[in-house]
Curated annotation (Swiss-Prot):
It comes from Homo sapiens. A motif (9aaTAD) lies at residues 115-123. Glycans are attached at T73. This is Myc proto-oncogene protein. Changing S77D: Phospho-mimetic mutant; abolished regulation by AMBRA1. Changing P72S: In a Burkitt lymphoma sample. The modification N6-acetyllysine is found at K158, K163, K172, K290, K332, K338, K386.
Length: 454
């Protein structure tokens, strides 16, 4: 199956269009066929008026894109991948994955060819490059470049072509034996830096896309200047590393693709991410030795802080529960400063008391024994009270056979029964007194009769 091969050409990049299957067209004229539907006056030239003013019209009815207005997309940053050299344009020709030696294709492996084809076809270059030619003079003044949906395609298309050109240059430099490798590496690094500065200068000016002034922290210009300043110190490090490296080193000096340069803004963002939590505080243990990042030579002296394991600490949270049964407090209202001091002292006292009052095992066992003894005695008392009620119920004639009689009924019936028994007792006592008197009388009469008979 045939794909595409990247071939270097010595012509300047301005002569090569981004897509060979589409011709250069000015798509501003495509709106002329539907212009009467958008404007009342057919003779009005809307795009010319906007290009002269270089500002968006104030009336929403004059611009259909005003309804979809969003913040413009900033231009893409220059590529940081390895092996970028002097600018050269990319021609697209069919080739096969067999790796023939003709045409310089034998130096590419299958994985490299697939990666180049993926980057060529996967970057939406066809969808982005057919709109208009970026080398055209009217490209910067085009109305589509100021729209939020089309403002980022030009820089992406240029960077795709530069990426494809860089792969072949890097492979040729690494594949061909060169006795003066240190000199070639120095020239490659210097060309790489020049290409980065050229790519940054060829990006779209943000003032064209978004003419209104922004803050220093959010303006795209400041981002571009930060990028250029981040790349500027890397040239010294690259040159110094090439001078210190031996001549016979088999590996050329290239920048790592997956490691972006670390700047001071990255370290500041990582420091801002370390926040404290109220109950569980997260702390980072600092390593004894500072570890510098040797993987990316474009760090420019900034070292990334090492990632250390997180340590969770439990903090004491004092909870104060209100005692509703206590009488209202009569303390005086202290000032705010004194109240804060007293509260802090009280909290510290509670913490110290909680630490000190760790009860020994002996006191715990004694409390358990006391509690068990109290439970046993309470159970015995309840059982005795129940048995006494049952005995009282059995003494009452009305409740003698009623096993489900409640305690209140038992007490009432027992009280009535006691009163009746006491009344009967008084009656019997009075009868006994009468009988005693009768007996005394009879005794006295019998004594008289006996004396008379004698």
């Amino acid at each position: 199956m045939d794909f595409f091969r990247v071939v270097e050409n010595q012509q300047p990049p301005a002569t090569m269009p981004l897509n060979v299957s589409f011709t250069n067209r000015n798509y501003d004229l495509d709106y002329d066929s539907v212009q009467p539907y958008f404007y009342c006056d057919e003779e009005e030239n809307f795009y010319q008026q906007q290009q002269q003013s270089e500002l968006q019209p104030p009336a929403p009815s004059e611009d259909i894109w005003k309804k979809f207005e969003l913040l413009p997309t900033p231009p893409l940053s220059p590529s940081r991948r390895s092996g970028l050299c002097s600018p050269s344009y990319v021609a697209v020709t069919p080739f096969s994955l067999r790796g023939d030696n003709d045409g310089g294709g034998g130096s590419f492996s299958t994985a490299d060819q697939l990666e180049m084809v993926t980057e060529l076809l996967g970057g939406d270059m066809v969808n982005q490059s057919f709109i208009c030619d970026p080398d055209d003079e009217t490209f910067i003044k085009n109305i589509i470049i100021q729209d939020c949906m089309w403002s980022g395609f030009s820089a992406a298309a240029k960077l795709v072509s530069e990426k494809l050109a860089s792969y072949q240059a890097a492979r040729k430099d690494s594949g061909s034996p060169n006795p003066a490798r240190g000199h070639s590496v120095c020239s490659t690094s210097s060309l790489y830096l020049q290409d980065l500065s050229a790519a940054a200068s060829e990006c779209i000016d943000p003032s064209v896309v978004f003419p209104y002034p922004l803050n220093d922290s959010s303006s795209p210009k400041s981002c571009a200047s930060q990028d250029s300043s981040a790349f500027s110190p890397s040239s010294d490090s690259l040159l110094s590393s090439t001078e210190s490296s031996p001549q016979g080193s088999p590996e050329p000096l290239v920048l790592h693709e997956e490691t972006p340069p670390t700047t001071s803004s990255d370290s500041e963002e990582e420091q801002e991410d370390e926040e404290e939590i109220d109950v569980v505080s997260v702390e980072k243990r600092q390593a004894p030795g500072k570890r510098s990042e040797s993987g990316s030579p474009s760090a420019g002296g900034h070292s990334k802080p090492p990632h250390s394991p997180l340590v969770l600490k439990r903090c004491h949270v004092s909870t104060h529960q209100h005692n509703y049964a206590a009488p209202p407090s009569t303390r005086k209202d202290y000032p705010a400063a004194k109240r804060v001091k007293l509260d802090s002292v009280r909290v510290l006292r509670q913490i110290s008391n909680n630490r000190k009052c760790t009860s020994p095992r002996s006191s715990d066992t004694e409390e358990n024994v006391k509690r068990r003894t109290h439970n046993v005695l309470e159970r015995q008392r309840r059982n005795e009270l129940k048995r006494s009620f049952f005995a009282l119920r059995d003494q009452i004639p009305e409740l003698e056979n009623n096993e489900k009689a409640p305690k209140v009924v038992i007490l009432k019936k027992a009280t009535a029964y006691i009163l009746s028994v006491q009344a009967e007792e008084q009656k019997l006592i009075s009868e006994e007194d009468l009988l005693r008197k009768r007996r005394e009388q009879l005794k006295h009469k019998l004594e008289q009769l006996r004396n008379s008979c004698a």
